[in-house]
Amino acid sequence: MTLSPEDIKIIEKYALQNAVKYGKAPQPKAVMGKVMGECPQLRADPSGVSAALENIVSEIAKGNPEAWEARLSEIAPELIEALSVKKEPDKGLKPLEGAETGKVVMRFAPNPNGPATLGSSRGMVVNSEYVKVYKGKFILRFDDTDPDIKRPMLEAYDWYMDDFKWLGVVPDQVVRASDRFPIYYDYARKLIEMGKAYVCFCKGEDFKRLKDSKKACPHRDTDPEENLMHWEKMLAGEYEDQQAVLRIKTDIEHKDPALRDWGAFRIRKMSHPRPEIGNKYIVWPLLDFAGAIEDHELGMTHIIRGKDLIDSEKRQTYIYKYFGWTYPKTTHWGRVKIHEFGKFSTSTLRKAIESGEYSGWDDPRLPTIRAIRRRGIRAEALKKFMIEMGVGMTDVSISMESLYAENRKIVDPVANRYFFVWNPVELEIEGMKPVVAKVPRHPTDHARGMREISIENKVLVCAEDIEKLNVGSVLRLKDLCNVEITSLSPLRVKRSETSLEDLKKAKGKIIHWVPVDGIPVKVCGPEGDIEGTGERGIETELDNIVQFERFGFCRIDAVDGENVVAYFAHK
């Protein structure tokens, strides 16, 4: 065969791609493999391709990387884009397959049976960020059609909205599945009429036995008219709880039992917590059915979901096939394990809160967004933390320290510094006259000025700072003076003439302190509460992030007269 000009251009573009990728003249063997793999029509003339490739490589070798990239951009710009994708790090957001700017529609679909957790925040952040990148539409859909096992919490709807606001995200549309039962019922009727769904009266264990044996239940071949009659009776309340189930007809001999005639609707004579719904319905759609319908109705183009939901996609595909719909492009990601929290679920956390083990959903020991917000974690830190995980099938095991590191970059430049002494002991400075210590509000931002701390001859210090010292030990009271211990009981010191430089050379301790008339401070954190005394001025920082020197960053949560409550963020 004779190679056409188009064939020559194909060889040239792959040779150029190889050159641009590696920054040197292309490797003929690698290019040959690429050409033959991508262009089966050229396999009939390997010698002709090889000869053409030799000439092309020879010409390319005369150029430079800039010229190679310019030529590749001219004849095959898509290969430049492909190289850009491959050069991206494994972390971060990769381009969405088939995504078009302005046409991407994505959703985050939580069950509002509790507030957003760190685990669910991944979906909140990544989906909304993708929509932002592609200038698309972002939908918050509450999958709230389980009145029993994962019963919705009324407060959780607003909590999710509030958390999205905190993240700087305003959903383009908010949907509550519990408002859309008529839509689900309409599609159920259509499937029954098509002979693709049937009402099953088997007991759960009986159906499972038949399903596991790849045998149809006695109701599978009931004609559509009779199934419609049973369906209407289900809706009318003529059957009892779990007496009848509407099933989607799939392949009863499918190799995966989870895909065999799965349940789409069940009867549960329970009220919904939303007063607008209440006792309005007794036939409840299961998540796979409602989700399938919603993703079509709302025009979803892309879905990102956990790899544990791969079977959900396979089940839903039957509905899409029956109606002739195109399933959204779907990406699955692995589980996230956060070292400090291990395995947790919203239902177990809820029970622990109800039992009094935790003070509420914003208890600093919990892995909820409400809790980390209260502790002073910033939205931008969480967003970067989640985006850096990337989107892949591999399970992610990560420490909160990574989140803290991102947050530290944000709060360190803005947090005023204060002294806070925990487990305080009184220290007397012999011969000290009343003095006003001037201490920087921030170590590098000098424009903020100084904080003035008035003391007489006594201060409070942390007991642990004194524990291993002896009479004669020299240390420095930070931003005040160098002292030498003269007595351990009672604790007394005298001014020392030792210079700061000599103290540092001798590796003497530099400790913080507060006046004896400081204010009571309680710090609530993941490891429990710590009480102590803080310097005055902390009470003016309500809702701000501050740094308690030598302790950590904290958010001032409450000020009640002379008492301050702070929430620990991190070191």
Curated annotation (Swiss-Prot):
Its EC number is 6.1.1.17. GO terms for biological process: amide biosynthetic process; glutamyl-tRNA aminoacylation. GO terms for cellular component: cytosol. Its main location: cytoplasm. A motif ('HIGH' region) lies at residues 110-120. Gene3D superfamilies: 2.40.240.100, HUPs, Ribosomal Protein L25, Chain P. It is an enzyme of class 6 (ligase). PANTHER family: GLUTAMATE--TRNA LIGASE (PTHR43097:SF5), GLUTAMINE-TRNA LIGASE (PTHR43097). This is Glutamate--tRNA ligase. The gene is gltX.
